[in-house]
């Protein structure tokens, strides 16, 4: 019996057999301006010749799976002959879902996995639980960790003790990668070019140029300087999808600091946008979201736990999710948490080698556990007892 591990994120699906490697694939469908009638699914995005003005059709809204038609089509593609050629009669599935997922969504997922696809056994689990499992496997002497999962829709801060989540201390911050990309689109549209329809391009800009500032006000001062002294300023060449397929940053020595470029390239000049956008993760109030930033929320979450456990959490802070890839993210989380923590506590912040696939790797390890069979719900169980057996088994 093989096991398929699917970390079903709101932006990317991380999928692969437990004996194999992982693929990161867009969990959505696309329509392009040029081929209006055709819908592209998942990694068919690579077939789109001109991805400008790309229209996204997402199965998730605000972090919850609501568009089942789109999700089914993405899964059909992933499980079908183009990708994983799943033999449902000989396959179990480990699949992730959000914290405190709605009962109706959980039941729909049971029905689709068991009744439509007919998997032999299912384990539905939070992505953070898989990350915690991976962390405890790598650090067997540790009993506690706090998973900071900063993804597309929002950021969750979840303490785990002996692989059990502490529900009373879970915190959700309503800031994720989607909000950052949208904010960058608004800033650029207001200051330079109208890019409100260019989600795909601006998301790439964000990933290429943004970083987390270690000293926001100092960087702001540098960004105001003229010419060579402004080390923050960068020129980004936008793709035209004929000669330039993917945007890139101009090397500093090629930057024209005054006047215009001779070549016909379309240029975005970015300065304080580079660090002001990721700053929202640390100060959501900058754009009117009255919530704590990530470091403050980590400390607040740990302070909600019994005092004797707190030192163990402070020294096992694990960063996962796409936003943790911003340069400087780990250092900023560490320095701010350190400032807010009693001096006699050790603080350690861990950034895994690949924070996007970290929970998938945890799922791969769980599938190799001796007690894996006790964790899943089999198809016979489900056919006999319905949703109630899933409700008992899965701690969502």
Swiss-Prot record:
Keyword Transcription: yes
SMART domains: ACTIN (SM00268)
Modified residues (N-acetylthreonine): 2
Annotated compartments: Cytoplasm, Cytoskeleton; Nucleus; Nucleus, Nucleolus
Keyword set, alphabetical order: Acetylation, Activator, Cytoplasm, Cytoskeleton, Nucleus, Repressor, Transcription, Transcription regulation
Protein family: Belongs to the actin family. ARP6 subfamily.
Subunit structure: Component of the chromatin-remodeling SRCAP complex composed of at least SRCAP, DMAP1, RUVBL1, RUVBL2, ACTL6A, YEATS4, ACTR6 and ZNHIT1. Interacts with CBX1, CBX3 and CBX5.
Function, in words: Required for formation and/or maintenance of proper nucleolar structure and function. Plays a dual role in the regulation of ribosomal DNA (rDNA) transcription. In the presence of high glucose, maintains active rDNA transcription through H2A.Z deposition and under glucose starvation, is required for the repression of rDNA transcription, and this function may be independent of H2A.Z.
Protein name, entry field: Actin-related protein 6
Organism per entry: Mus musculus (Mouse)
Lineage, highest ranks first: Eukaryota, Metazoa, Chordata, Craniata, Vertebrata
